[in-house]
């Protein structure tokens, strides 16, 4: 990670990437690198708006970057054919638009969004993925650390997958800070076009998350 200024940062990483790790028949301990393994590299530039705790302006963070994976990928419409390498680009951002209290307060309304684009349609199930939403921290009086969340997620399927168009998910959640170290978050999702198929009925998904901070 490099930080040319307090607001601007550059980061990159390189990782060992082995598709064989997904095989359910693999077991035991293995520290070697298989001949089928490749590498995954990712980099991003990030800009923070009003990053200091005492800044009077509303904070925000914006990121742009890309990635490359050197492994072999099968064609979606012909699994017998493969190509080497896959890449994508991403844009992510979050910005507080309303704040309760003075500078440094984390209570208020923050909006966020993201876009991921993997242009090679023949090997990427979801070449397009977009998300947007909002979080309001301290919406309920007396619950300053709770957060009400609404988000939507859109995935556009590859044109090489006939019958699959898009999937849209609407999500509502409420993160309750039970203690300083325990957060409980019930979650409700409504899934439109599950799996990208209009022939499949829309679905309601109910869940919850439990977070413990040590």
Task: Show the residue positions of the predicted features.
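Short loop/turn motifs that connect adjacent beta-strands in outer-membrane beta-barrel proteins
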Residues: 7, 49-61, 98-109, 138-147, ...
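Outer-membrane beta-barrel "beta-signal"
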Residues: 202-214
């Amino acid at each position: 990670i490099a930080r040319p200024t307090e607001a601007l940062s550059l980061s990159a990483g390189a990782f060992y990437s082995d598709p064989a790790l997904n095989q359910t028949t693999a077991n035991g301990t293995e520290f070697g690198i298989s001949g089928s393994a490749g590498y995954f590299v990712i980099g991003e530039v990030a800009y923070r708006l009003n990053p200091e705790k005492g800044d009077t302006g509303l904070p925000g963070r914006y990121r742009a970057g890309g990635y490359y994976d050197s492994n072999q990928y099968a064609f979606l419409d012909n699994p017998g054919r493969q190509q080497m390498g896959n890449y994508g680009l991403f844009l992510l951002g979050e910005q507080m638009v309303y704040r309760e209290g003075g500078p440094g307060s984390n209570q208020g309304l923050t909006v966020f969004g993201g876009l991921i684009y993997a242009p090679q349609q023949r090997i990427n199930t979801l070449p397009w993925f977009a998300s947007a939403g909002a979080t309001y921290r301290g919406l309920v009086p007396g619950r300053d650390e709770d957060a009400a969340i609404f988000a939507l997620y859109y995935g556009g399927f590859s044109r090489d997958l006939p019958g699959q168009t898009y999937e849209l998910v609407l999500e509502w959640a409420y993160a309750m800070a039970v203690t300083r170290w325990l957060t409980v978050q019930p979650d409700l999702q409504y899934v439109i076009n599950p799996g990208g198929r209009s022939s499949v009925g829309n679905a309601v998904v109910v869940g919850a998350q439990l977070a413990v901070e040590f």
